[in-house]
């Protein structure tokens, strides 16, 4: 079982005399920078010159520099850039400014685990990964609570890497909900697996296929959308709040019996075998190699798949239905 560390077991001592540079001011970047700043820590934001986020970060009361200048000024550097952009920025603007005893921080282990970034031996390398989107990390912090997080130490050059990770996690509010100790390998491989077979890939494929089956069988696309896509949130919210047990308890007996008897026929041993194949490609680096090579040529396959998704009948019908739900449109705009 994982080791869990809570707020009253941590302090800011490891970071009190350090300068933290948060590279990026997107979903996670703005939450990390503002939470750390409001926790009383010394924070600067690193952005490319001319970034549209520059003025926003300054208006939030933060000091902003270029990535090059920020990495020179800081001794704890959190890289919150897209996975495919991290290595190029690191080697051109961060590594040349690293000093012995500095710390590199990541919120996902992809680039370290797959050797896209190979840090010098005289710096600490650790991970702090909140298990929630940036706006939730920020909102829960302001409410005096937090989202759970993960910490991992990859390289402990100073003997202080774990203490730094815990202080950083405390600074963004994660220790309020508990932080779980893991490794870069475990976080990376389980995160990619979840994205591919369940949360993003598996769920979207299941929704689309179920929608297509109903439409092909002659049912109205609108009815198919409601039953296979729109209502997913209702079920997921129940699972999120109380696990599968809460969901089964909350649905009708008809839904429970049908779901329990038919579900295993749909997600069956063939599906399990495909999941193991996906996991193997993650573990042996095949997926990482494929993704990195795809990025080197500007993601032609990804862009083609994105176009196909936008043109799918599910998306066309979904946009029409959502247009008739004003409160839903307002919520999306607010987020």
Swiss-Prot record:
This is Ketol-acid reductoisomerase (NADP(+)). GO terms for molecular function: ketol-acid reductoisomerase activity; magnesium ion binding; NADP binding. Its cofactor is Mg(2+). Keywords: Amino-acid biosynthesis, Branched-chain amino acid biosynthesis, Magnesium, Metal-binding, NADP, Oxidoreductase. NADP(+) binds at residues 25-28, 48, 51, 53, 83-86, 134. It comes from Methanosarcina mazei (strain ATCC BAA-159 / DSM 3647 / Goe1 / Go1 / JCM 11833 / OCM 88) (Methanosarcina frisia). The keyword Coiled coil does not apply. It is an enzyme of class 1 (oxidoreductase). It holds the Pfam family KARI_N. Its EC number is 1.1.1.86. The gene is ilvC. Residues 1-182 form the KARI N-terminal Rossmann domain. It catalyses: (2R)-2,3-dihydroxy-3-methylbutanoate + NADP(+) = (2S)-2-acetolactate + NADPH + H(+); (2R,3R)-2,3-dihydroxy-3-methylpentanoate + NADP(+) = (S)-2-ethyl-2-hydroxy-3-oxobutanoate + NADPH + H(+). Belongs to the ketol-acid reductoisomerase family.
